């Protein structure tokens, strides 16, 4: 709702900046998110882009089992948003989605980014237990080694 207020303020003030907000699939279980989404579409806030991290995990388990907001794309479309679905692990898809969102007129845009929680760290991938937990020293070293190896592969 803060991002919606910022986007509305920009529109009313004749400003050209865009507003971006990041939401989790667990977070969008909250009513305030949908009230803001409805308002943003009603006001045609095409300067607003919401990126929804869709990994189906939250601190207490599977998003679908706790309080399912699925199907997310259809819900945002029903609320009057432009929807772009991407793989959150593809830099090309991320870049294209932000470009498309910035060019779309008349509606706010929701980028639904399908992701894997902890991607790139073998013992963290797809585990909700890491939502609010810090790794110990040994785990940290292993995680950094795995991420550095992945980075080296990308740069090769």
Summary of predicted features, one role per range:
Residues 1-156:
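Glycine-rich ThDP/TPP pyrophosphate-binding loop and its adjacent helix/strand module
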